[in-house]
Design a protein with these regions (language model features):
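Metal-dependent phosphodiesterase/phospholipase catalytic core, i.e.
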Residues: 1-139, 143-144, 150-153, 157-162, ...
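Flexible, charged surface loops at secondary-structure boundaries
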Residues: 148-150, 213-214
Length: 221
């Protein structure tokens, strides 16, 4: 693919390709406006421009997607992303940036071979990932978290790996956050959606309160 080719595509909220119906019908209408697919550089320009005009200091949190697949296409996606971030001043832990990735070998490479000095998050999955040999079941263990702590600053688990439900009104919480915090890792669970709540949460406020107050995670996605 080329940037010019991708720019011909229209970006929209998620929809079911079989029916054309929006997956989340309460969000921005599908097909209402012909938004283009932005590049990472354009997104960084937007964030920094809005920071200037609004007097804010919002950071960025990009994800390295499928590094193994990209290498098979002859592209080092991690090096490319880190180079773009560096051009815009995102280099160290003093800068407002987190880089995240599901592939543990790539997370280690980002910190070691590529020499990235900023904040780094190992994403966790509750199932296999496309073209990744990462053993996510192991990474969720204390031993696995210990390996993560050698190279990363935090973990990003799905909600269900932190809270499994409620029994008699009490949250059923796994040991993941406790174990991660004991190793100095931050925990940023994903994905918080007001229109796709876990079965145990009666409202978005309840979901936020459970994770931020009762469980004590460090951030949300």
């Amino acid at each position: 693919f080329t940037v010019a080719g991708l720019k011909q595509l229209a970006a929209s909220e998620r929809f079911d390709p079989r029916t054309g119906n929006a997956v989340f019908p309460g969000r921005f209408p599908v097909g209402r406006s012909p938004f283009q697919v932005p590049t990472l550089e354009e997104e960084l320009q937007l964030v920094q421009g809005l920071n200037k005009s609004r007097g804010r200091d919002a950071g960025v949190y990009p994800e390295i997607k499928e590094p193994v697949w990209h290498r098979k296409q002859g592209q080092d996606i991690s090096r490319i992303v880190l180079d773009v971030l560096a051009r815009y001043g995102y280099r160290t832990k003093a800068d407002k940036v987190y880089v995240q990735c599901f592939d543990f070998e790539e997370v280690k490479r980002i910190r070691g071979e590529l020499g990235y000095q900023g904040r780094l998050v190992q994403l966790l999955a509750d199932g296999p990932q496309f073209e990744s040999a990462t053993d996510h079941a192991f990474l969720r263990t204390r031993a696995g978290l210990g390996e993560i702590a050698k190279v990363a600053d935090g973990i990003g688990p799905p909600l269900g790996l932190v809270v499994t439900g409620k029994t008699g009104g009490a949250l059923q919480v796994t040991d993941l956050v406790r174990d991660a915090h004991a190793l100095g890792l931050q925990v940023h669970p994903y994905t918080f959606r007001a229109d796709a709540l876990p079965a145990w949460a009666g409202s978005f406020d309840e979901l936020l309160r459970a994770f931020l107050v009762e469980v004590g995670v460090d951030g949300i996605f």
